[in-house]
Curated annotation (Swiss-Prot):
Belongs to the class-I aminoacyl-tRNA synthetase family. A motif ('KMSKS' region) lies at residues 287-291. SMART domains: DALR_2. Its main location: cytoplasm. It comes from Flavobacterium johnsoniae (strain ATCC 17061 / DSM 2064 / JCM 8514 / BCRC 14874 / CCUG 350202 / NBRC 14942 / NCIMB 11054 / UW101) (Cytophaga johnsonae). It catalyses: tRNA(Cys) + L-cysteine + ATP = L-cysteinyl-tRNA(Cys) + AMP + diphosphate. It is an enzyme of class 6 (ligase). One of its GO terms (biological process) is cysteinyl-tRNA aminoacylation. Its EC number is 6.1.1.16. Its cofactor is Zn(2+). Pfam families: DALR_2 (PF09190), tRNA-synt_1e (PF01406). InterPro entries: Cys-tRNA-ligase, Cys-tRNA-synt_Ia_DALR, Cys-tRNA/MSH_ligase, Rossmann-like_a/b/a_fold, tRNA-synt_1_cat_dom, tRNAsynth_Ia_anticodon-bd. This is Cysteine--tRNA ligase.
Length: 492
């Protein structure tokens, strides 16, 4: 019997503003889409928090034995500066400023994004589509929206008429905004725009002559609107109606509101059952901003190369710190806060290291089954990681009492307890045992150095066939050798 059948889950739905029982469209299967990064700069810590929250959600669904299709996109075209329809594409602007091809910018920051997520022990999504890889699908959606009369072409661009859409639907259903108020608070276009209404948004933009990123379409050589990209990619891989759509709270309006409108205009149905949004990350009580210097990149935390923190902190400590707050709560990052988290993380890991030495008794003096269910209850309550972590520290207390002989545990309970705590720490929260990792790295270094010594001896004996064989097999394992004046070094 799958674990999910005995662990009912509640999710806070931004659409209803309430916690709701989670019931997937197809039993045992979860379709989840999360808006990924626009790859024009280094991923910032707030982004990492959002993606980490959904990484834990993905992990927990897998732990509950669901089959999950997790789609997280890469936006590599169409995201206009200031998130409006007029102006310059963010990637094109970066390319112009740095005198690069747009796809060089995309490649550089996509690699950075993946490197950071790997460092923080993220599971890869099931599918990671790019906007530029789905231009045809986006054009087809635009055609359908035009056919409904809600989309209209103007001078080579295509816009979504929110007023016409709102006649039969509710533009503002997710954000709680009222279209009349939005229109009243928007300046008159005064003939300076091709839009019928100030709140109309672009489905397709005609490219100016100097615009590099462009594709042919029935309306012009141009590029798709930002909101359309996620509609095309989510529905292609998850269908017109799927379980979960997530992202940062800043995407609720206009991005996610526009996605709902596009889907309903195109298919006649609401696309998503559960909308989930993560809250922001502040730094020393203030909003992060590059312009004010109140900013820190993930890599700067790991290296210690910053003016904010007293020292470097590991990826696992940073991850542990972030998960101590619920994903819907504002989290303030500071030197004091992450230093305290480091102490807690070390306490947890020390307890786990001591667990294998615990001796089983004939019976248990603690209800370990109740503790285990309390861990599930925390995660089943809208993925409440801080409550789960509190339960893990309760387990640390149990382990210390067991070490001191002040509590007892049966062999059956010890096995169940050990399996559960390791699953919640490593599989669900995605933490890493850094001491074990460091030990493995030391062992690897020792083995490679031994092979380098064997290779050096083979070269001295003029046994070049063996020397080349050792080098080639190390390369096949991803280990590069570099011969220099001071000897041979290696990199992975």
């Amino acid at each position: 019997m799958p674990l999910y059948s005995s662990q009912p889950l509640k999710i806070y739905n931004s659409l209803s503003g309430e916690k709701e029982n989670f019931k997937p469209i197809h039993e045992g299967n979860v379709g989840m889409y999360v808006c990924g990064p626009t790859v024009y700069s280094n991923v910032h810590l707030g982004n990492v928090r959002t993606f980490m929250s959904f990484d834990v959600i993905f992990r927990y669904f897998l732990h509950l034995d669901y089959k999950v299709r997790y789609v997280r996109n890469i936006t590599d075209v169409g995201h206009i500066v200031d998130d409006v329809d007029e102006g310059e594409d963010k990637i094109a602007k970066k390319a112009r400023l740095e005198q690069l091809e747009p796809m060089e910018v995309v490649q550089r920051y996509t690699v950075d994004f993946h490197d950071i997520l790997k460092a923080f022990n993220f599971l890869p999504p099931s599918i990671e589509p790019t906007a530029t890889g789905h231009i045809i699908e986006q054009i087809e959606i635009i055609k359908k929206i035009i056919d409904t009369g809600i989309g209209y072409e103007a001078n080579g661009s295509v816009y979504f008429d929110v007023v016409k859409y709102n006649e039969t639907n509710n533009y503002g259903v997710l954000s709680g905004r009222n279209i009349e108020d939005m229109l009243a608070n928007t300046r008159d276009l005064d003939g300076q725009s091709d839009k019928r209404n100030p709140q109309d948004f672009a489905l397709w933009k005609k490219a100016e002559p100097e615009h590099i990123m462009r594709w042919p379409s029935p309306w012009s050589d141009g590029f798709p609107g930002w909101h359309l990209e996620c509609t095309a990619m989510s529905t292609k891989y998850l269908g017109n109606h799927f379980d979960i759509h997530g992202g940062g709270m800043d995407l609720k309006f206009p991005h996610h509101e526009c996605e709902i409108a596009q889907n309903e205009a195109c298919t006649g149905q609401s696309p998503v059952n559960y909308w989930m949004h993560t809250n922001m990350l502040t730094l020393n009580g203030k909003k992060m901003a590059k312009s004010t210097g109140n900013n820190i990149l993930p890599g700067e935390i790991l290296s210690g190369d910053n003016t904010i923190l007293s020292k470097a902190f590991s990826a696992s400590v940073t991850r542990f710190f972030m998960l101590q707050a619920h994903y819907r709560s504002i989290l303030d990052f500071s030197d004091d806060a992450i230093t305290a988290a480091e102490k807690g993380y070390k306490r947890l890991m020390e307890a786990l290291e001591a667990l294998p030495a615990i001796k089983a008794g004939s019976s248990s003096s603690v209800d370990f089954a109740a503790w285990k269910q309390a861990c599930y209850d925390a995660m089943n309550d809208d993925f409440n990681t801080p409550i789960l972590i509190a339960q893990l520290f309760e387990a640390v207390r149990y382990i210390n009492l067991l070490k001191e002989g002040k509590e007892t545990i049966s062999a059956e309970d010890l096995k169940s307890f050990s399996t559960a705590i390791n699953a919640f720490v490593f599989d669900v929260l995605g933490l890493s045992d850094e001491k074990a990792a460091d030990g493995n790295n030391d062992k690897l270094e020792g083995v490679v150095n031994m092979l380098i010594g064997m290779r050096n001896q083979a070269r001295a004996d003029k046994n070049f066939a063996l020397s080349d064989q050792i080098r080639d097999q190390l390369i096949a394992l991803g280990i590069q050798l570099k011969d220099g004046k001071e000897g041979t070094s290696f990199s992975i």
